[in-house]
Amino acid sequence: MTLGGGPPEPAVRRYWKASDREGVREYPAMHEGEGTIRVRSFFEGVIRMGVHFDVWELPPGATEGRHTHRSDDPKDDWEEFYYVVHGRGVAIFEHEEVELEPGDALLVPPDVDHGLANRGQEDLRIVLVIGKPGPP
């Protein structure tokens, strides 16, 4: 993470900059899925918006296993926003599959069983924002 936006050692931090080429973690069999998903999380410990901001890369054949974030569990009542940047994938729900391609966005509220699969020939790259849902 690079600090910048002012003199060499500013008294007040004005902004943070990060690269998706650094700090990548690998998650094999995420939620009992197939293959390994590469995840880059941004601004952990710095961001105050109440969200997690990640970039995920699923190689061909990789999946995030189906799972549910439960609204009755304060540690797991997440809402997830997916935005497809590159590649093609499939969002998997209990009784439906939804094709995803670059430019598509998907919002999954708590209590919805869901997963993700890359059935294409190239990496599937997704921006994922995870946060607690607000009041209706």
Feature roles, as predicted:
Residues 1-55, 136:
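A short, N-terminal "cap"/entry segment at the start of jelly-roll beta-barrel domains
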Residues 41, 54-75:
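Conserved short histidine dyad/triad with adjacent acidic residue
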Residues 47, 90, 110-135:
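Ligand-binding loop in jelly-roll beta-barrel domains
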Residues 77-89:
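Glycine- and acidic-residue-biased ligand/ion/polar-headgroup-sensing regions
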Residues 95-110:
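Short acidic-glycine-tyrosine-enriched beta hairpin
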